[in-house]
């Protein structure tokens, strides 16, 4: 277990002082000059320079494991746009891959695993996981990116949530109905909890190692939490997200933690019951309503989101109007901080890069 405060991490790596702390201030509910903004999947296939670097690497995982190229693609959107954060270029499925399931990608079909995790025999064959060793290439990338940023903006580390990773590991890839995962949930819930507990321990180790390597914020992507029924969300997803956050807060109390549950807007009352600094929202939840719900809690929780990524297919005028409406909602309660502008999910490969710039600029041009 690593217990290092932020000063220890900064001094160990001799990182440059942070110049733009707008996003961190918003997370702390401190006054800000303008709304901080970044985009999920901001280093991605909508950028021609990303496509060129990925082609040089040969395939996606080779790109992730190449420190110099992973650093390069992380920096690319920051050269184009006035973003307020960088996010580590990697994939949420690095943990299952390191556990020996054999991650690979098929064109047009997304990620797949050579092995699945459906029986106790499968579980017993999982390889031992130690983030610093099993995923050393991720930590190398984190440190390299921090040095390349030179204090420009803070760096997000991230992981998939236990529930989301479990669905991939059990299904063997993406799924529309989560047949095998939900089959375990309703027929062998104790075994599914055993799997989730094991993955949660790995996630804590993984995010802890990213923080020690230089990540200044971490985000937990609960991409498929919204596939669960209400009571099952609390038991099979939130319970484990809460444990991740609590453990990270014990080890690194000064490092903000964001939890993003796609489709989780209905369960803000459940998600409030954690130490998360910020909750990410998709486009289905109005920001004014979300902030009003969170304001009833015992402590302040920031919000991140939540423009529909498809909005970026529209005209520049439409994008600006949509951003203004989103920020009107975000600040409707009168509090002009505690909010990070983002998309409601990752930016898609078909977006015109110019329109992504319109989005970022429109956020910064909004008068607080």
Curated annotation (Swiss-Prot):
InterPro entries: UROD/MetE-like_sf, Uroporphyrinogen_deCO2ase_HemE, Uroporphyrinogen_deCOase. It is found in: Cytoplasm. Disulfide bonds: none annotated. Catalyzes the decarboxylation of four acetate groups of uroporphyrinogen-III to yield coproporphyrinogen-III. It catalyses: uroporphyrinogen III + 4 H(+) = coproporphyrinogen III + 4 CO2. It holds the Pfam family URO-D. PANTHER family: METHYLTETRAHYDROFOLATE:HOMOCYSTEINE METHYLTRANSFERASE RELATED (PTHR21091), UROPORPHYRINOGEN DECARBOXYLASE (PTHR21091:SF169). Belongs to the uroporphyrinogen decarboxylase family. Its main location: cytoplasm. NCBIfam families: hemE. Homodimer. Substrate binds at residues 41-45, 91, 168, 223, 345. GO terms for biological process: protoporphyrinogen IX biosynthetic process from glutamate. This is Uroporphyrinogen decarboxylase. The record marks 91 as: Transition state stabilizer. Keywords: Cytoplasm, Decarboxylase, Lyase, Porphyrin biosynthesis. The gene is hemE. One of its GO terms (molecular function) is uroporphyrinogen decarboxylase activity. GO terms for cellular component: cytosol. Pathway: Porphyrin-containing compound metabolism; protoporphyrin-IX biosynthesis; coproporphyrinogen-III from 5-aminolevulinate: step 4/4. Its EC number is 4.1.1.37.
């Amino acid at each position: 277990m690593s217990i290092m405060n932020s000063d220890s991490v900064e001094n160990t790596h001799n990182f440059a002082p942070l110049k733009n702390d707008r996003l961190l201030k918003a997370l702390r509910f401190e006054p800000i000059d303008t709304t901080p903004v970044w985009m999920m999947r901001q280093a991605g296939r909508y950028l021609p320079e990303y496509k060129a670097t990925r082609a040089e690497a040969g395939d996606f995982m080779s790109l992730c494991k190449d420190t110099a190229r992973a650093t390069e693609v992380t920096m690319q959107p920051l050269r184009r746009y006035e973003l307020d954060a960088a996010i580590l270029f990697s994939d949420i499925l690095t943990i299952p891959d390191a556990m020996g399931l054999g991650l690979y990608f098929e064109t047009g079909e997304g990620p797949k695993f050579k092995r699945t995790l459906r029986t106790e025999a499968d579980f017993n064959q999982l390889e031992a996981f130690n983030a610093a060793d099993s995923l050393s290439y991720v930590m190398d990338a984190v440190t390299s990116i921090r040095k390349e940023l030179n204090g420009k903006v803070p760096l997000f580390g991230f992981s998939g949530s236990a529930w989301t990773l479990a669905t991939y590991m059990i299904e063997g890839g993406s799924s529309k109905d989560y047949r095998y995962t939900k089959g375990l949930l309703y027929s062998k819930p104790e075994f599914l909890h055993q799997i989730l507990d094991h993955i949660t321990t790995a996630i804590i180790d993984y995010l802890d190692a990213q923080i020690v390597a230089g990540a200044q914020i971490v985000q937990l992507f609960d991409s498929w939490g919204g596939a669960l029924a209400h009571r099952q969300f609390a038991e099979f997803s939130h319970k484990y997200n809460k444990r991740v956050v609590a453990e990270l807060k014990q080890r690194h109390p000064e490092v903000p933690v964001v939890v993003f549950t796609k489709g989780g807007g209905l369960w803000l009352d459940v998600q409030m019951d954690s130490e998360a600094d910020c909750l990410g929202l998709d486009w289905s939840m109005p920001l004014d309503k979300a902030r009003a719900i969170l304001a009833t809690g015992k402590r302040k929780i920031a919000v991140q989101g939540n423009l529909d990524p498809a909005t970026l297919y529209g005209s520049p005028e439409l994008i600006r109007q949509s951003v203004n409406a989103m920020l009107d909602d975000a600040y409707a309660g009168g509090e002009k901080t505690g909010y990070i502008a983002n998309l409601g999910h990752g930016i898609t490969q078909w977006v015109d890069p110019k329109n992504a710039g319109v989005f970022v600029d429109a956020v910064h041009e909004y008068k607080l």
